[in-house]
């Protein structure tokens, strides 16, 4: 039972610890929204290429 107060104090300290979001941003940091937009754009390009190549092979040649 004497360990219970120590355990509770540790839980409170862990909960109040600063998170990763509290770190200051630098000029090299990229926002997560921008990262998701780039990923979405890349997936759209790849899916368009896959669709194009299935139905028209000459279209694939224009992709490089």
From Swiss-Prot:
Tissue expression remark: Expressed by the venom duct.
UniProt signal peptide: 1-22
Subcellular location: Secreted
InterPro entries tied to this protein: T-conotoxin (IPR031565)
Keyword check for Signal: yes
Recorded GO MF terms: toxin activity
Keyword Signal belongs to the record: yes
Residues modified as Tryptophan amide: 63
Protein origin, superkingdom: Eukaryota
GO annotation, cellular component aspect: extracellular region
Entry keyword set: Amidation, Cleavage on pair of basic residues, Disulfide bond, Secreted, Signal, Toxin
Pfam families reported in the protein's UniProt record: Chi-conotoxin
Pro-peptide positions on chain: 23-48
Posttranslational modification: Contains 2 disulfide bonds that can be either 'C1-C3, C2-C4' or 'C1-C4, C2-C3', since these disulfide connectivities have been observed for conotoxins with cysteine framework V (for examples, see AC P0DQQ7 and AC P81755).
Domains: entry comment: The cysteine framework is V (CC-CC).
Family in the record: Belongs to the conotoxin T superfamily.
UniProt protein name: Conotoxin Pn-B01121
Organism: Conus pennaceus (Feathered cone)
């Amino acid at each position: 039972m004497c360990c219970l107060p120590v355990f509770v104090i540790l839980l409170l300290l862990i909960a109040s610890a600063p998170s990763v979001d509290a770190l200051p941003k630098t000029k090299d940091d990229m926002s997560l929204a921008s990262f998701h937009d780039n990923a979405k754009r890349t997936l759209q390009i790849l899916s368009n290429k896959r669709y194009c190549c299935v139905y028209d092979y000459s279209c694939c040649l224009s992709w490089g």
